[in-house]
Amino acid sequence: MKSGQAEIMETSKGIQKSGLMSRRIAILEFILRIVAFFNTIGSAILMGTTHETLPFFTQFIRFQAEYNDLPALTFFVVANAVVSGYLILSLTLAFVHIVKRKTQNTRILLIILDVAMLGLLTSGASSAAAIVYLAHNGNNKTNWFAICQQFNSFCERISGSLIGSFIAIVLLILLILLSAIALSRRH
């Protein structure tokens, strides 16, 4: 009789330990979603408010550089805004994962949506990175000149917004891995 009770006690301790680990993973997932949200919304705002005007010879002729002059940078802003909106909405499901234990269906849904948002964010950041590279280095074969010697503030801001977006990409990858780990621990 005592050995049966001992087995039950060990099993219940294992379940409690597994439940505690799942809760920790859910809390970490919640925190990573918040941090990723601030990175994506910060990148969208930083890029969306980027504007610099340079006088040329006289006060009447000016050159301007804005993010919406280039479609790739506009796509970057939209992609970051969409992903930040998704991350805010996904916080509700992440909170449910902290409170409840049986959340396999919502975890699968979050993995699918996280992968879709990762693809969107990666494509937006990659297209913007190509434009930022051209802004810094130019392309001699096509006679595209580097503009960052003239538009210092513009180039610093678009480069900074890329950093935030790439950090969010890494965080989304971690979120996908955490959700997969949490799912695998349940089976």
Swiss-Prot record:
GO terms for cellular component: Casparian strip; plasma membrane. One of its GO terms (molecular function) is protein homodimerization activity. The keyword Electron transport does not apply. Signal peptide: none annotated. One of its GO terms (biological process) is cell wall modification. It comes from the Eukaryota. It is a multi-pass membrane protein. Glycans are attached at N140. Residues 1-24, 96-107, 183-187 are cytoplasmic. Homodimer and heterodimers with other CASP proteins. Interacts with CASP1, CASP3 and CASP4. NCBIfam families: A_tha_TIGR01569 (TIGR01569). Regulates membrane-cell wall junctions and localized cell wall deposition. Required for establishment of the Casparian strip membrane domain (CSD) and the subsequent formation of Casparian strips, a cell wall modification of the root endodermis that determines an apoplastic barrier between the intraorganismal apoplasm and the extraorganismal apoplasm and prevents lateral diffusion. This is Casparian strip membrane protein 5. It comes from Arabidopsis thaliana (Mouse-ear cress). The lineage of its organism: Eukaryota, Viridiplantae, Streptophyta, Embryophyta, Tracheophyta.
